[in-house]
């Protein structure tokens, strides 16, 4: 079930506050966050986020095509190790 349109997209307040402050100052330093659940909004375009994947922070540069997705979608938590190929 999707989120109600009445509520709007979820973005952590501390994250939105940092983005707005950086837009006013016109800074582009990376923003470190654990908030994988936050939705990417149009005002985040052009910013770099360091999103935690459970072990380390992965750098995510936000572009126009990412709007509407969540930050966690661009920071994978699992690494697939391929199965060995049988020779012979």
From Swiss-Prot:
Belongs to the universal ribosomal protein uS19 family. Keywords: Ribonucleoprotein, Ribosomal protein, RNA-binding, rRNA-binding. GO terms for biological process: ribosomal small subunit assembly; translation. PANTHER family: RIBOSOMAL PROTEIN S19P FAMILY MEMBER, SMALL RIBOSOMAL SUBUNIT PROTEIN US19M. GO terms for molecular function: rRNA binding; structural constituent of ribosome. Protein S19 forms a complex with S13 that binds strongly to the 16S ribosomal RNA. One of its GO terms (cellular component) is small ribosomal subunit. It comes from Chlamydia pneumoniae. Disulfide bonds: none annotated. This is Small ribosomal subunit protein uS19. Gene3D superfamilies: 30s Ribosomal Protein S19, Chain A (3.30.860.10). InterPro entries: Ribosomal_uS19 (IPR002222), Ribosomal_uS19_bac-type (IPR005732), Ribosomal_uS19_CS (IPR020934), Ribosomal_uS19_SF (IPR023575).
């Amino acid at each position: 079930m999707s989120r109600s349109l009445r509520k709007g997209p979820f973005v952590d307040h501390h994250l939105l506050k940092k983005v707005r402050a950086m837009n006013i100052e016109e800074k582009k330093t990376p923003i470190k966050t654990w908030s994988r659940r936050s939705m990417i909004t149009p005002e985040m375009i052009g910013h770099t986020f360091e999103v935690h994947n459970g072990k380390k922070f992965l750098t995510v540069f936000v572009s126009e095509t990412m709007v509407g997705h969540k930050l966690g979608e661009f920071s994978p938590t699992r690494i697939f190790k391929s199965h060995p190929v049988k020779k012979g």
